[in-house]
From Swiss-Prot:
Dimer of dimers. Pfam families: PTSIIB_sorb (PF03830). The phosphoenolpyruvate-dependent sugar phosphotransferase system (PTS), a major carbohydrate active transport system, catalyzes the phosphorylation of incoming sugar substrates concomitant with their translocation across the cell membrane. The enzyme II SorABFM PTS system is involved in L-sorbose transport. Signal peptide: none annotated. CDD domains: PTS_IIB_man (cd00001). This is PTS system sorbose-specific EIIB component. SUPFAM superfamilies: PTS IIb component (SSF52728). The gene is sorB.
Length: 164
């Protein structure tokens, strides 16, 4: 399986993803990897309906995403992975899914999180997950839109003296 793009965007499929990122990815399908979304039938249905024209969308559990990645039947597939958080990415990478670059595009503010950029808010567990991904060799590309300059999220955390 060839991963053409892996992106964290907690809105999952929305305007930027359907009009820009899906073209950047140039993949045959979008695979949304998240247990909570997989277990929410209404959300799963809505996300499939929001698919960009001509692109298949699958919403799968992390376990299924890892199994499909390792299945030789899908070795010629090109995929665009969408995640809601770095913890799910870390789980998959630890199970042998080879993600070279992770684009971080949107992580909404919630209680307990601090705003790093307009589109990305983090808590200490998120930062730790990004550090682990970095140690595992995953390039961390903080970009909301494709035309933004690429910035390593850990550099941004360090330069802004972002407190954990």
């Amino acid at each position: 399986m060839q991963i053409t793009l892996a992106r964290i965007d907690d809105r999952l499929i929305h305007g930027q993803v359907t009009t820009v990122w899906s073209k950047v990815a140039n993949a045959q399908r979008i695979i949304i990897c998240n247990d909570d979304v997989f277990n929410d039938e209404v959300r799963r249905t809505l996300l499939r309906q929001a698919a960009p024209p001509g692109m298949k969308v699958n919403v799968v559990s992390l376990e299924k995403a890892v199994a499909v990645y390792h299945n030789p039947q899908y070795q010629d597939e090109t995929v665009f992975y969408l995640f809601t958080n770095p913890h799910d990415v870390l789980t998959m990478v630890r199970q042998g899914v080879q993600i070279a670059t992770l684009n971080i595009g949107g992580m909404a503010w919630r209680p307990g999180k601090k705003q790093l950029t307009k589109a990305v808010s983090l808590d200490p567990q998120d930062i730790q997950a990004f550090r682990e991904l970095d140690k595992l060799g995953v390039k961390l590309d903080l970009r909301v839109v494709a035309s933004d300059p690429s910035v390593n999220i850990l550099d941004k955390i360090n330069e802004t003296a972002f407190c954990e």
